[in-house]
């Protein structure tokens, strides 16, 4: 018993779900069909004059579009069931538009948010519909919103038009509205959000009478009765319009279609001219940026060469400031450019002193290092040659041969190793010189 009851309940639930999904599908189809009729009516009505709020066709179209955007909206859904043509609970689609259309470049969302006379979400949604139509960007807004599938699923329940393929059909229909000029005043009772949205279906209802139910006898009876003088009613199956009227109506429809296509052609041409001007501006900007890039590259090359020259100059200056290992040798060679013999006192001066027996202590010049002197200093032996012989009565002097063996190191060149002693033997700082006439003065290291 319980099993059968559960099965019955499940069957009823499945049937109710199927009925609900079928009703939702019917709602989608009806709304899209009515929207197609409304757009077609607007295109047929449009002439050179812009369409405003006084147009019944626009009022009906705005109501239909608001119903489509509010179809199965989650935000303010009431607790009880709501019919698909009702607007009591279908509110708040502006919250979805505000988030989903914020990525549209140069959008009107912020300007609508800052309007002082519009406070409710419904009023802002209606204002957005009018502004988007005046901007001729309604299809662009809807397309951008549909791309944000995450936000769309967040605001709409399953089965909504914005989540089905009918949304793509809607964007295709809204493209044709770009050829129409709209002019609206964003003030008044229409935008206060309190007036309910009502769709008028009478312009889209078409009554077509069928004559299939008439039998042959009835047709003959009607034909016979039409010949009588007393009874001459107009038969319902007879054509009410002549061929001329039918041709005129066809011509009128073709003219309207031509005007619509011509208006769309003008809009597309204007759009192409706008895109061409934008392309030219972008090309000019690209050329200007390319020139700036080339100038910057040339300037960078010049600065690089200048910096390389500065680096080389600084390296030369740094090389001149760093002391080399042979600097003491060069300084020593400069000090010893004069012969070393001239640095010693003359022997004649010693002979002319107060007494011959008095010995004097002479200090030799001290050198910081004898090894550099032995390597770099040179004495000209040819210019300081002494004479071959000397007399006992003549004082010792630079002229003549010096018989003193200890003074041989001062003759000749220090650079010639075979002809002189090494200066390494002169490491002592003092030597005694005796000017006694008995013998040659001797130098002995102390």
UniProtKB/Swiss-Prot annotation:
Claim: Lyase is one of the keywords in the record: no
Residue span of region Disordered: 216-239, 372-404
Homology family: Belongs to the RUNDC3 family.
Organism listed in the record: Pongo abelii
Protein name (database record): RUN domain-containing protein 3A
Record-level GO BP terms: positive regulation of cGMP-mediated signaling
Record carries keyword Phosphoprotein: yes
Modified residues (Phosphothreonine): 215
PTM annotation (Phosphoserine): residues: 232, 416, 419
Region (Interaction with RAP2A): 1-298
Disulfide bonds: none
Biased composition (Polar residues): 372-384
Coiled coil regions, renumbered to chain: 267-322
Domain RUN: 52-189
Listed PROSITE patterns: RUN
SMART domains xrefs: RUN
Keywords in alphabetical order: Coiled coil, Phosphoprotein
Subunit structure and binding partners: Interacts with the GTP-bound form of RAP2A.
Function statement: May act as an effector of RAP2A in neuronal cells.
């Amino acid at each position: 018993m319980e099993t059968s009851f559960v099965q019955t309940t499940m069957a009823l639930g499945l049937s109710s779900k199927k009925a609900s999904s079928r009703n939702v599908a019917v709602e989608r189809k009806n709304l899209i069909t009515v929207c197609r009729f409304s757009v077609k009516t607007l295109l047929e009505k449009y002439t050179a004059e812009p369409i405003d709020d006084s147009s019944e066709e626009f009022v009906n179209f705005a109501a239909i579009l608001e119903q489509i955007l509010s179809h199965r909206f989650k935000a303010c859904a009431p607790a009880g069931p709501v019919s698909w043509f009702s607007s009591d609970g279908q509110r708040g689609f502006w919250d979805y538009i505000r988030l989903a259309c914020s990525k549209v470049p140069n959008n009107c969302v912020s300007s609508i948010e800052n309007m002082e006379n519009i406070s409710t979400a419904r009023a802002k949604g209606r204002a957005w519909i009018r502004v988007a139509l005046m901007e001729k960007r309604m299809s662009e807004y809807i397309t951008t919103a549909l791309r944000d599938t995450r936000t769309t699923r967040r605001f709409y329940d399953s089965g909504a038009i914005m989540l089905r393929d009918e949304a793509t059909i809607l964007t295709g229909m809204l493209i044709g509205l770009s050829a129409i000029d709209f002019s609206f005043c964003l003030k008044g009772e229409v935008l206060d959000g309190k007036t309910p949205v009502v769709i008028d279906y009478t312009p889209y209802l078409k009554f077509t009478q069928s004559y299939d139910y008439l039998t042959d006898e009835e047709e003959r009876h009607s034909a016979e009765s039409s010949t009588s003088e007393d009874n001459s009613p107009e038969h319902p199956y007879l054509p009410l319009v002549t061929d001329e009227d039918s041709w005129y109506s066809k011509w009128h429809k073709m003219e309207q279609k031509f005007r619509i296509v011509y208006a769309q052609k003008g809009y597309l041409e204007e759009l192409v001219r706008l895109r061409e001007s934008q392309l030219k501006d972008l090309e000019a900007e690209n050329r200007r940026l390319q020139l700036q890039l080339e100038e910057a590259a040339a300037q960078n090359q010049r600065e690089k060469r200048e910096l390389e020259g500065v680096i080389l100059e600084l390296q030369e200056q740094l090389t001149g400031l760093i002391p080399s290992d042979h600097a003491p040798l060069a300084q020593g060679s400069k000090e010893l450019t004069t012969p070393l013999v001239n640095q010693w006192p003359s022997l004649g001066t010693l002979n002319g002193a107060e007494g011959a027996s008095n010995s004097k202590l002479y200090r030799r010049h001290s050198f910081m290092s004898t090894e550099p002197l032995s390597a770099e200093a040179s004495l000209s032996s040819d210019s300081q040659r002494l004479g071959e012989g000397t007399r006992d009565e003549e004082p010792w002097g630079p002229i003549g041969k010096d018989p003193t063996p200890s003074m041989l190191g001062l003759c000749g060149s220090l650079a010639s190793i075979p002809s002189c002693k090494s200066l390494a033997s002169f490491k002592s700082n003092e030597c005694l010189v005796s000017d006694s006439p008995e013998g040659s003065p001797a130098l002995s290291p102390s």
